[in-house]
Structures are given as structure tokens and as C-alpha cells.
Amino acid sequence: VFDSGGNIIEYLKNINTNQGIDDMVLISYDFQAGSYIKKAEKNSEYEGKRTDIYAEIFNNLGDFDSIMEVGVGEGTTFSNIVPKLNNRNVASFGFDISYSRIQYGQKHLKGKKMDSSLLFTGNFFNCPIQNDSVDIVYSIHSLEPNGGKEKEILTELYRITRKYLVLIEPIYELSSEQSKVHMDKHGYVKNIYKIALELGYKVTDYRILFEDNLQSDNNTGVVIIEKNSKILSKRENISPLGCPVTKLPLSLHKEHYYCKDSLLLYPVINKIPCLLPENAIVATHFFD
């Protein structure tokens, strides 16, 4: 299916598999690993202009010391955004459900001399991040195939956000009819703005980003949710990583991550922290 240019998620849905959408996304994206870097390199001018706009959105949010992309993939967009941020010393993080994509992303960032950025595996239904620990949490077209899970995703991403949650995703309600047909077919997320308001969140921006792109299948929009922008104190030298099961702090010990509260160990493979809930190993005597 992948070699013929087909949509793997659509294929898995059509064969009536019992797998959930997160498993389908994992399989699909793992097959695609490496392809996004090639695409970005072929379209470097487009990527540059697009990320200029994204970086401007973040820079206009005021002071922040940490930023994280959920569904970071191979880091192609991430690697173009972080160097354009006003804070050159910002702590930057990214996670993705696919180990293979993170592996490619790690190599990609190394080539960009972004060794200080940390990439790891994780999913946004059980983020391996502590509460209120990252100033700006953002997504770029990573939530889109998770239609029906909007409330669950928003609640979890809001939990880990310290100042702003920025969702750069196709917005069904503001899109063209052509786009809506495409989004309905592929089960895209809907009603993000409405659900955010129902959850009591403060939405400060809600619009289509590229008006000249209204006839495309994916009308990229932005939803900005302000959580607590007035926080001035920094979380200096404090890792935001947390156990995806308990949300409590993880510490690096014997080259792996361990949660002393839950007694769960998470392996680091090829310098990639594997922080999916299913990666957890019960290790009650890890410090012995």
C-alpha cells in the first residue's frame, strides 16, 4: 500500500481491523519514516516561508523558555522553527508515536547542529510530560487524523501546557467544501474551537492561516489557547519529562529513565527515550 502511494490509515480502516486509531497512525507513520525529510529538502523555500509564519506566531506570544512539538515526526518543521525564535536559549522538545521517525529526526537535528533539542517517543493521549511543565506546546497537522478524540487530546495537551497551547491544524468549520469532503473521508478532527470553549479554555486566536490556500484539501488554521501567560518564573534545569502512566517526574539513571514514584523504568535506545505507556518496565529494585 505504501509503495503504491496509498493511504495506509484508510486501508487499515477499510479492512475492518480491530486496531485503534493510534495504532493505525503508528503503523502508517513508521512506514513513512524518512520520506518527510526528503520532501522538505526538495521544498526548502516553501518550508522556510511556512515556518517564518509559525515562528512569528510563537514570538508574538511574549517571553517563554521552553517549547515542544507534539507529533514532531522527523523534525523537519521543528528544525526550521526553533532557530527563528527570539529566545536563542529556549529549551526545545518534541515527541512522536513512531520510533523510526524520531530516529530519522534525531539524525536530521544533528545535521542542523541542534543537539540540545530532545526528541523522544510518546503519544498525545498519554503524554510523557509532567503537569504545567512546558511554556508553549504546539502541534502542526499531527492531530488531524484523530477525529472523535478531540476532547481527550485537548484535555491532555492542556494538562502539560504552562502558558500557551497552539494548534496549527486544518479547521473543518472554516474550510472550503472541497476540504470538508477530504476531512470527512479521512476522519479528521472537528470542532476544536467549540470543544475548547466547552472545556472552559480561553481561546485567543481562531482563524485560517493561509487565505490563498482555501481551495486545498488541508486548510491550515490556528487555534491558540492561553492557559497562564502571566507566569514569570522559570523552570530552570528542570526536565519536563514525566511517567506517561502517573505523570510524575522521570529521572535519568543508569542511562535510562526511571520514575521512583511508580517504580516504572523506560528504556533509552540509541539515545532515544522510549516513553510510550507500553514501554514501561516494572523495576522495583532498579536502584539496588
Regions found by a protein language model. Give the residues of each.
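Class I SAM-dependent methyltransferase SAM/SAH-binding core
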Residues: 74-125
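Conserved SAM-binding loop and adjacent beta-strand
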Residues: 38-53
